[in-house]
Amino acid sequence: MAENMQASRPADDGWTTVIRPRSGWFDINLKELWQYRDLTLMFVKRNFTVLYKQTILGPAWILLNPLITTLIFNVVFGNMAGMPTDGVPGFLFYMAGNTVWTFFANCVNNTANTFVTNSQVFGKVYFPRLTMPVSQVLTSLINFLIQAAMYLLFWLYFFATGAEVRFTLWTLAVPLVMLQVMLLGLGVGIIVSSLTTKYRDLAIAVGFGVQLWMYASPVVYPLSMLDESPRLKVLVELNPMTAPIEVFRAATLGTGSVSAGAIVYSVAFTVAALVLGVVLFSRIEKTFMDTV
């Protein structure tokens, strides 16, 4: 059973820890979460150790995964399907979209099984349960920064060889946009994680669902390609990941279709998903040991 921890200091006995049941729909103690930041960082380290343990290439997969995926996109969608890339090198176009999408997908997939995979730990010792999903998105953030560095190296190569790519003022917004992507992934991930305590099918479906979600996002095609299909373009713009991907391309390639309305909608969706996720997480953590 999840509890809320508060500290008090009796006059003679020194510090003690008082654990009280949580109450309310939105009962998340951010101060307590910050106090356990060392534990969160320890979980981040554990995530890396578990993920690459007994692998031949180890952390090199952080770079190989998006690189191989980008090459496949370039061959299939660029060379074979002949999809436009808004006048920029196809390799950079696909890597830009894939870098942002991989960050989001990792945030969702890695937090989606928080309750199920950590049930034994949750049942033995008290700590803020939210440290688990937070550690997962921080792990994904580190992976993203490494992949973004690789993207920058390829960008410099193409720029040096005369490709028409450039950084724009949108670059200033990239840190905030990536924070939004991380929070959106956290929100969606903990929603799924909360529901999987009762509906295990979601744990299986989430990976497939994220893959389908990618094709509803402008990862392998430019949003401008849908100008002749207004209804389809509206549907794609309803995807909260459309704006972050387009902003990243606008920032680093000088292309992309970015509007203030799309950004506001994406941010609002992120806030709603995060609030809903935290509410569900707060409610489910009280009883999940009875269902997992």
Language model feature labels by segment:
Residues 1-292:
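Hydrophobic transmembrane alpha-helices and immediately adjacent juxtamembrane helices
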